[in-house]
Each structure stands twice: as structure tokens, then as C-alpha cells.
Amino acid sequence: MSPAAAAADGGERRRPPLGGREGRSRARGYGGPAGAAALGLALLGLALYLVPAAAALAWLAVGASAAWWGLSREPRGPRALSSFVRDARRHPRPALTASPPPAKSPVNGSLCEPRSPLGGPDPAELLLMGSYLGKPGPPEPALRQDPRERPGRRPPARSPPPASAVQRVHHVYPALPTPLLRPSRRPPHRDCGPLSSRFVITPRRRYPIQQAQYSLLGALPTVCWNGGHKKAVLSPRNSRMVCSPVTVRIAPPDSKLFRSSMSEQILDTTLSSPSSNAPDPCAKETVLNALKEKKKRTVAEEDQLHLDGQENKRRRHDSGGSGHSAFEPLVANGVPAAFVPKPGSLKRSLASQSSDDHLNKRSRTSSVSSLASACTGGIPSSSRNAITSSYSSTRGISQLWKRSGPTSSPFSSPASSRSQTPERPAKKTREEEPCQQSSSSPPLVTDKESPGEKVTDTTTGKQQSSWTSPPTPGSSGQRKRKIQLLPSRRGDQLTLPPPPELGYSITAEDLDMERKASLQWFNKVLEDKPDDASASATDGPPSTSPPFTFTLPAVGPAASPASLPAPSSNPLLESLKKMQESPAPSSSEPAEAATVAAPSPPKTPSLLAPLVSPLAGPLASTSSDSKPAATFLGLASASSITPLTDSKSSGVSQAEQSVSTPASTASSPTPKPSMLFGMLSPPASSSSLATPAPACASPMFKPIFPATPKSESDSPLPSSSSAATTASSSTAPPTAASTTPTFKPIFDKMEPFTAMPLSTPFSLKQTTATATTTATSAPLFTGLGTATSTVASGTAASASKPVFGFGVTTAASTASSTMTSTSQSVLFGGAPPVTTSSSAPALASIFQFGKPLAPAASAAGTSFSQPLASSTQTAASNSGFSGFGSTLTTSTSAPATTSQPTLTFSNTVTPTFNIPFSSSAKPALPTYPGANSQPTFGATDGATKPALAPSFGSSFTFGNSVASAPSAAPAPATFGSAAQPAFGGLKAAASTFGAPASTQPAFGSTTSVFSFGSATTSGFGAAATAATTTQTTNSGSSSSLFGSSAPSPFTFGGSAAPAGSGGFGLSATPGTSSTSGTFSFGSGQSGTPGTTTSFGSLSQNTLGAPSQGSPFAFSVGSTPESKPVFGGTSTPTFGQSAPAPGVGTTGSSLSFGASSTPAQGFVGVGPFGSAAPSFSIGAGSKTPGARQRLQARRQHTRKK
């Protein structure tokens, strides 16, 4: 400090002498030859720059630097430049030869001495100069001197002649390159002492004396200030600075700012402003300087008013106790001085914006007022962005500020601060009230109205108590605010009042509250529009109700279960009606309802009903057309014993689709999860009775994009509504299976409808697999809705209707005894926790952009494109690519399993496009239990053998592949091969696009058909996992997206372990427990036995079942053969290899951020003996726990 101050002081004093012509004459007097030399050098630089004779790049560089510097200096003193030029022209050589500069300072001497001998050959001098420039050592000291002198000179720059100045100028030419200048300047403050000593040789001796004085003052900037403008202001600053370290830091930027302002006045902005900024030792200072400069520009008058500045400072001093105490509180609070300034600067800008009473505003109230001015309600206003972003992630912060301001006024003894605060706050509160109301945080409004009183009442009250509870923080906050008010305008950084913020701790709760508020706001906006559209569309609510009523009759058959469903069904209808009436509220409700729904089935229906109601609107529209049926919209039935409830789209003529099975199905309303941007309602599993039939209705993502508007297209239905089936199973494990309304066949019209956009489940008929369990998943095309697949009770299989479901994948897992309903919801933000009841997990895969949801028990939610692993028991696994690659797969131990891969792009468990393109609608029902395949587009049906024999149904689905389930796989391949020639595909082995079906590897995928990217697994990045029955038959057919398959000869990106298929980012896992790898952009969550994989992460195989999935191997090769694929076999591509922890399996995933290691802790190599490397861009393989922690950290950072 002292040396820097001294240097600064020296600079200041220099300024006056240099500033006047006296200075010039004086400079010449003591450094006339030096001045001449400097001028000569400048001229040489210009001449060289202009003269082609100096062709060397060094010459050009030197000349250019000199010219640039000279031009930059010009504004200060055009005269000076002209004088330079004139002098140089008159006697360039003498100037060069003159050696007085060396005498003046060793550094200068060193630079200049060579020059004097070289005076003859100017070019040589220039070269030397260039060399010096290149050399950091000598030029830096010179530069150090220069910056100080420059500050001094800047005003004087008008008169460049001073010899010392000239010398520096010489150095400056070389030094001009910013890189040198910056370091040099930074050193100057540090090295002021030695530099000053160097200077001592010449008149600089004065400077040391001044330095001592200023050092006593304790602020370098003060000196600059004094030299430039406001010594008086600086002196108070200095005293303050001396009082508090914070001030010291703040001051230098101020001085620099003042310098810059002076330079601007001088019109020397080009050099001076950069120089002033450059010297700032800390980036913070530079930032502060920029802000201050802006403020000064806006409030130049205020800054220039020394009286006002002094008054403010005086007030601070007068308040003395308050002002100083404010600083003391900072120290007491443990707030670093540096920290305080930053908020101060921001607040200053705010305060500067409101320039009513500088004094009043500057008082702490100003800070409060600035906060208040920024409606810090639900969304922090831009007024204090940085602070609001960090602190007011919770709206409460602004309130705290306000609160602390008013409350502190009583606390703070200083009357001045008090008087100031009430004045500004009252005004601010009035101003802010509307803002806060708009922000939609009533507590905030109340707080602002009566900050002291209401704040305590409102949530801010908590904050206040928390941060006022320490007496020092509260008082300090008040005092600080005062300080901030005064100096902030003056550019005094001393008055930054972070303490209230510091005192207030932002908790996760605050962040959550803020998020919720924002989400609610979004939901209202989004829901109102879609709901309105749906309402308009849903002119035929009765039609929508019929489906429910339909389901209700089904419910009727089961006596006790029926009774349970009946109430729920009524709530559904009622809720649908209500929802139609007021869609917006329902959307907000669904998340809450979904969460609450789990407790009791009746409750669940009611809760679900609101969820469904948004669907109902779209459904109503669809039903009005009667073409689309929201099939099973509300229908999730847990049939006590009955396997699958009849699900029928009421509107659709496809009554056929509904599976009529002993339908004592409780039609539990499927919640339509309304997903507003960030909020996902967790699917509620209602298992009121002992039978744990998890009814997970996953919230559906409310289609934002698709409008429900046209009843004819009825597109909204599929998009908006997904049948999230909640099975409220009153008793037996029997599971309710409901399928969501399916996507209308775009290509092929369903007979019932003419409308192309949506079709209820594509296949006209749902086939019920007699097989003990079948999984049905219906993806919705919109990708907004997730198709919920319900598991039929063990006895009956529910046919699964895949919907096109652009972004959604549904996995249905069924346990023979237990039902699982899986619903996927797409939500951008959070994933709903999935609750699973009983052994059968309900899977909700959510489409989340960001965070993976933690799977409840067995259920895993898919995050962005995260696949769910299904519960261990359920036999059926579906993998869907789901629009962005989220797939949930279920592997079940149930003896009979059906695995239906869903088309990744078009997600279909069962052929989504069953019929379109004349694919035969009838699914080929294998006699084998649970084998139900509906060909879509030419999907080969995978169900070929009884459980043991794995059937590989590979479909060429665009991204879809069917995983064959050994026991029975209905592998509807969408788009692709159909067991039935749909589309003319070969039935058994239909190769779509010429890919051989099943066993033949297509494009290097073994069992899989060519399928564009995937064989059995596929989905664009979805892997269908082959779920194997309880027998551990490795039925998993490996398919490659882009040809990854373990057996596959050629894998585009990776080879999957024979069972595992690497899909784009997905892998299918073979083996009794199949893990599905999905292509999830975000995080893979390792969940219950099935783990979901994040972007490329591979979900681990569940528990002990050996299975390898290598998900996404862009270049991951995981092959038992260990044949290198693209990236090499087990070797990690991109250098990550996941050790195979599990004997049973190694899962490698490509996760961009994290790689998942197999969840199970088996260290052994995979059954095939190869560890699947995961391709992770960023991270080495991490255990799921580590990954979760990582993700948690990331999320926390986001919160901040």
C-alpha cells in the first residue's frame, strides 16, 4: 500500500507539474536532452513505420506500436504530439544521442544508453527497442515507472515535452503492447518502493516524500484522485480506507476510474482508459471500474461534485459509529472487504439508476431501495442481477434487504441512517408493490409495504430472523447499507452492503420455493393455453367420459376391486369434467396430486383425475371426432385377479383394441401428469390394498407444442394425454394394464378415423396375451405424453399398444404375480419419484432434460433420455427410444416375459404403427404365454418360442428394435419387419430395408434386423433389452444401433457384448436380468436392479443377473470376443474403461459426463468375460453412488 500510494502520490504530483506548461519547461529543464531523445525516438518510430526502408517486421512492429501509442496519446495533447514530431524533426539525432535519460533512472538508462550510441543508426535503436520489448525484465520496470508517470502525465499528457515523460514515452513505445503494460502496471503498485527509489535520482525525489504522506493516508487511488480531481474527496476516502481494508481495495479502482474519467475528459480514452483498467491488479477492480465508469458517465455530475462526495463521506464519518460499525460488522461478519465491494458496485449501479437523493439513497436504505426497485419477487429484476442471482435465488433476499433496512433503522442508532432508510424505503415499497405483485410473491408485496412488520410475518420473516438473529449481522447490514448509499454513488466502494445477504443463508428450500414459483407461473401460462385449447377441443367431454365409463364397466366385474375403482372412476369423470372446465388449475395440480395420489387408491383416482383432466380436454377433442380414442385414458385398472382390464379408446372404433379379459379392473384414473416446464408430478402409485400394485401414473408432459385445437386431427389427445395407469390394486397382485391412447397412425388411417395425425393405438386390435404377463407400453407420439404400460396380472397379458410417442418410451414390466404399471412422463425439469408398491415395481420413465429422477424402489425415471430399468421381477422389458432417447426397460424375473422394444424415435412397444402401411393389424399371437407381437410397419413379431427360447424379433424400426424376450417376445418392430408381413415385410424374419430379421445380424447386428440403427435394441438410441424369463436364458439379442452388436461383424460404433446391444447411446442387455441401456442425454441413474443410463451411460444389469449392456458406444466396443470395435473392445473409447465390477455384467455406458459402473458390485468380468467399456467423455467410470453425488453437485451448482 504505502509504496503504491507513494508511487501514486508521485504520479499525482507529477500531474500538476506535467499538467502545466511549467511541467514541460521544467521537464525540459531537468531532462531537456531526455525530452529531445524521447521525441527523437517517437519520430523514429513514426518514420520507420512510414518509411519502407525499414522492411523488417521488427521495425514495423516498433513503428506501429510507437504510432499507435502516439495516436492514443494525441487526444491528451495533440500539441504534445505535434511538439514531439517537430522536436524530432528538428533534432532527431541529438534527441537520440542525448544520454541524460540514463542518468535519470537505471532502467531508463539501460534502455536509453544503447540508444545513445545507436543514435546514428535509428533502425538499430528500433531493433534494440523491439528486443527490449521482447525482454520482460528491463521494459517492465520502465513500464512500471511509466504507468505511474502516465497517471501523473495523463492530464499533463497535454504537454509531453517533460524529459522524464519523454523517456517513459520511449519505453512506452515498446511497452505499449498491452501484455507488457498490464504486468508492468500491476508491478508498479507492488514495486512502487524500488521504482520510486529509481526515480529518486531525478526530481522524483519529491514523489517519495509525497508517497510517505499518501501512504499515511493509506490509499493509492487517493493520490491519483488528488492529482486528478478531488483530493478532498480522496482524503476522506483515504481515512475511510485506512479504517477499513475494504475501502483500500475499493479505492484503487476508484482512482483508476477517476483517472480514466480524466483521461476521457482529456480525450485520451484510448490509452488512458485501458491503462487505467489494465493496471488493476484484480479482475474485480477492472469490473468495478467498468461499472463505475458507466455510472460516472450517467452520473458524471454527481461524481464531479466534490462537495456532495465529501458530504457523503462526512456523513459516513459523522455517523461514525454507524459507518465504521458497518465496516466493523463486515469484519465481524467475516465478510471479506473485497467481497463487500462487489455487491456494492452492483448496488451502486442500481442506486445510481435511482438518483433522487444521493445521500439518502446511499444510506443503507439506498441499497435496500435498489433491491426493492428490482422487483425481487418471483423473478429477481435486473436491477441487482448479480446479487439477485446469487442471493435472491430466493425472492426473500430482497425482502430481507428491505426488511433489514427498515428493521435495522430501529436497530441502528445513527439517526441519519434511520431517517434516510425510512424515506427511501417507503417510496421504494410503493414503487415495488406492483412489481412484486407482478412477480407473484404476495409475501414480498406485504414485506415491501411494511417491510419491518410483514416481512417477519412472511417467509422473509424467517430469513430476517435467521439473519437478524445475530445482532451484529443485523446492525451491520443496516450500517453497511448506509455506507453503501453514500459511497456507492460517489464511486466509493466502501459502502458495499453485502452483509444482509451474507447474513442470510439461502437454503435448498429457498431455491426450491423459487423454482416452484417459476414453474407454477410457467404452468399457468402453458396450461391455460393448452387447456383452453383442449377445452375448446373437448366439446365432446361426454365422449371422453365414455372411455372412462367403458373402463368403469370393466371395473365392475371385479367385486371388491371394482368397488375401489368405481370411486376412483367417478373422480376421474368428475375430475375430467372439472379439468375441462378449468384446465389450468389441473395442470398445476397434477404434480401435487400425483404425489399425494399414492396414499390411497380412491385418492389416487381423484388426484389422477386432475392429471388426466388435461388429457381429458385433448381426449374430449379427440373423442368429439370420435376417431381418436384416448384409449385407456383414465383407465388404469388394477384387477384384483383379472389380468388386464379392457382398455378401449372410447372414441375409437377400435373397441377391438380393448382387451377384454376378466376385467375386474379398477379403472384408476390415469393421472395425466401435466408436466409444465420444470415440474413433474411424481407418479402416484396407489396400492391401497395389501396387493402392492403400484399404480404409477407418471405425469404426462403436457404437450406444449402440439395444440389440441382441432377436434378433427385430435392430435392433442395423444400428445397431451398419456394413459398413466395407476393400478390401485385392492387385493391380488393382479395388475391393471392400461395403454395410453396411441398415436394415430399418420400414414395409415385407422378405419375409425379419417384424421391422420393421431390414431388410437395403432393396431386395430390389441391382442391379449394369455401369457401370464405381458407388458404394454403405449408411447404417445407427442413425446409429451408418456405411454404408461400396465402389466396385466400374471394370468392375463395386456396387449401393449405402443404409440408413436416421439419422445416417450414406455417400458412395461410385469411380474407374473405383481402388476407393475409404468408410466413415463416427459418433463423438462424434475423427475417424479416413482413409487412402486409390492414386488412389482412401477416404472415411470420421465423424459427429463435435466436431472434423472431417483428411481423409487424398482421404478426408475428416465432422465433426458434415460432408460428406466424395470423391476427385477417383471418379465417384460420395453425399451423405447423415447424422443430424446429416454427409454425405460423392464426386466422381469417373471417366468414369461415379453420384451417389447419401443421404437426409439417412434416409440412403440407393440407396433405403434400397427396397421399403417397396410401392416396386418392382427398381431400374431404366439400360443406362448406373454408372447404378443404386433407388427408395425413390417415389424417381425419376436414372439416365436416359449419362454425359454429367446425369440429375436428385430424390427427395423426407424430407431426401434424389439428386444426379444425368450419366453415370448412380442417384438413389434415398428417400421420394420413384421412377423406378419405388414407392409409386405416377411413375417418371421422380415428384414426391413432388406435387413434379415432376427438371427441374421443386420448391418453387423446379430439377431437384430438391419434396423436403421438398431436391431433388437435400438431405438435411435434406445436399446431394447431382451428380458429373459426367470430361466436365465440369454435371449438378449444384441443389435447394434449403427451396427453395434457383440456378435455383429461390423458395428458402426461399438460392438455390444453378445447380449448387450449398443444402441446409439443405448445398449440392450441380454440375460435373465436385462438392463436396458438407453440413450439418455443426461444422467444415468442406477436404480433398482435395473439402472437407467445417462446419456451414454449403460444401465447396469439388475442384481446378479449377468448381462452386459454397452450403451452408446460411439466408439465403445464391448464385446465378449473383445474384438475391437471402432474404439476397441473393452478398452475404453476415449480412454475410459469401466472395470466390470459385476461378475454378472459389466455395464458400460457412454455418459458424457459420467460413466456408470455396473450397479452391482461384482468385480468379475462380465459373464462373457469382457468388461464393457463405457465411453464417457468427461469422467472415468464411477459407481452409481459417485455419479449421483456428481449429479447432485451439478444440480446444486445450478441452483446457485
From Swiss-Prot:
Region (Cisternal side): 1-56
TM stretches of this protein: 57-77
Annotated spans, Disordered: 1-29, 91-167, 177-196, 294-328, 345-509, 530-627, 640-692, 706-744, 1075-1151, 1173-1200
Subcellular location: Nucleus, Nuclear pore complex; Nucleus membrane; Endoplasmic reticulum membrane
Stretches for region Pore side: 76-1200
PTM entry text: Proteolytically cleaved by caspase-3 during apoptosis.
One annotated Gene Ontology cellular component of this protein: endoplasmic reticulum membrane
Bias type Basic and acidic residues, positions: 10-25, 143-152, 298-312, 424-433, 446-456
Keyword terms, alphabetized: Endoplasmic reticulum, Membrane, mRNA transport, Nuclear pore complex, Nucleus, Phosphoprotein, Protein transport, Repeat, Translocation, Transmembrane, Transmembrane helix, Transport
Biased composition (Low complexity): 365-374, 404-419, 463-477, 546-574, 581-598, 605-621, 658-669, 681-692, 715-742, 1075-1099
Family the entry assigns: Belongs to the POM121 family.
Primary role: Essential component of the nuclear pore complex (NPC). The repeat-containing domain may be involved in anchoring components of the pore complex to the pore membrane. When overexpressed in cells induces the formation of cytoplasmic annulate lamellae (AL).
Annotated domain remarks: Contains F-X-F-G repeats.
Protein name from the UniProt record: Nuclear envelope pore membrane protein POM 121
Organism of derivation: Mus musculus (Mouse)
